[in-house]
Structure formats: structure tokens, C-alpha cells
Amino acid sequence: MIVKIWDVIEGPIAAAECPEEGPEEANWYMVCRAEVDGIIADDNFWFEDFDDAYEWQKHFMKTIEPLIIDMSVMAGYN
């Protein structure tokens, strides 16, 4: 499954501040505008490391091009 991230709406935010439970190893999350199969919605994306999350934030400070993630190659997703 291909996910396109179009924008960071909010974050990085400490995972402890999230009302929903995320992955056990996640310390940070961001609310992002994402597209899956042509449908766009805001969703939470989880990160172990603040710097990894902030890389997404920096991407959108420079460009409006989406980040493209192939979830089929990520552990725990199919």
C-alpha cells in the first residue's frame, strides 16, 4: 500500500499527550494529511525518535511535494 503524506497538520507531539494508544515503542506522533487509494484524511503517524519526526516537518518547510511511503515494505504493515 502506498501512502502519500501531503502535510504535517500538528507535531511532533509527545506520545503521552495523545488520546489514542499508539505503538508501544513510539515516543512521538504527528497529525498528517495523508492519501491512501485516492482518499485524503488526517491521521496520526508514530515515531520512535523526535529527529525522525522533525525530518518530515522540515520536508514541508521546503516543498509542497508529498512524502511517499510504501507501507508494504515496513515491518508490521501489509
Report each predicted region and the residues it spans.
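Secondary-structure boundary/capping motif
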Residues: 10, 29-32, 48, 59
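A short, structured beta-strand/loop element
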Residues: 21-44
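Short N-terminal "domain-start" leader segments
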Residues: 1-29, 70-71
